[in-house]
Amino acid sequence: MKRTIVILGLLTAVVTAASSVNAEPLIWGVQVEQLENRFTGDAQSDVMAWDGDALIGTDELKFVVRSEGEFQTRSDRLETMETQLRLQKPISTFFDAVAGVRFDTPDGRDRVHGVLGVHGLAPQWFEVDADLFVSDRPSARFEVEYEALITNYLTLTPSIELDVPLRDNNDAEVAAWGPKLEVGARLSYDLVDRSVAPYVGVHYERVFGDTLDLREAEGEEGDGLFFVAGLRLMF
């Protein structure tokens, strides 16, 4: 109950801060950064993954729904899914403050988290997301992505993501300060005016520290290399 009150308080604070802004044209959009199949030499480990946003609002305040997850294609099972409801308000020319709530699926303990963070463009046009997830088992996440234009139609997008649990969570097989690192590179072809872009690439992930020990104790690998094929969509 206390956690819910805190989350609602954060959202209310952001809305109140924007209440004095004059009416502006409404903007909206959908951007799916990743909609892909990830392949390994073992079909049991192949997954379908997605990561996308939908937003509506103005330049001064945006409401964003973010979804990402993985689905085991071989076993026909949802492995993880994360849904965030976020409010974003500019704090500088290139960065927004973020406040919201995150829901994890499948159901389990501590599946609701408050979200505090920043989102924007760093120098040299690196897209940055830095979020703190507040709950009984808090964690932090840092993401960086860069779009390198090779030709008018070909774009190489390297990315890196670091998840750091701040407390043990045996249900999720993560240990405090045992981070998970994900690194990828995707080469896309602009098929329809940046709205549809098929891509291929590689994706590597690895866990460290006590999280690695937990995985190995369950007979699981601590890392994985995937070849990926998918679509980027923007409307």
Predicted regions and their residues:
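A contiguous pocket-lining binding segment that forms or flanks enzyme active sites
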Residues: F126-A175
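Residues that define the transmembrane beta-barrel architecture of outer-membrane proteins
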Residues: D46-W50, E79-T83, D110-G114, D136-A140, ...
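Outer-membrane beta-barrel initiation region
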Residues: V21-R74, K89, F227
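Transmembrane beta-strand segments that form the barrel wall of outer-membrane beta-barrel proteins
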Residues: V30-R38, L61-Q72, F95-T105, V118-S135, ...
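Outer-membrane beta-barrel channels and translocator barrels
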Residues: D59-L61, Q88-F94, L121-W125, L149-Y153, ...
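Outer-membrane beta-barrel proteins
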Residues: R74-L78, G108-R111, S139-R141, T155, ...
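Extracellular loop and loop/strand-boundary signature of outer-membrane beta-barrel proteins
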Residues: E70-Q72, F103, D129-A130, D168-E173, ...
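Outer-membrane beta-barrel "beta-signal"
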Residues: A185-L191, G222-F235
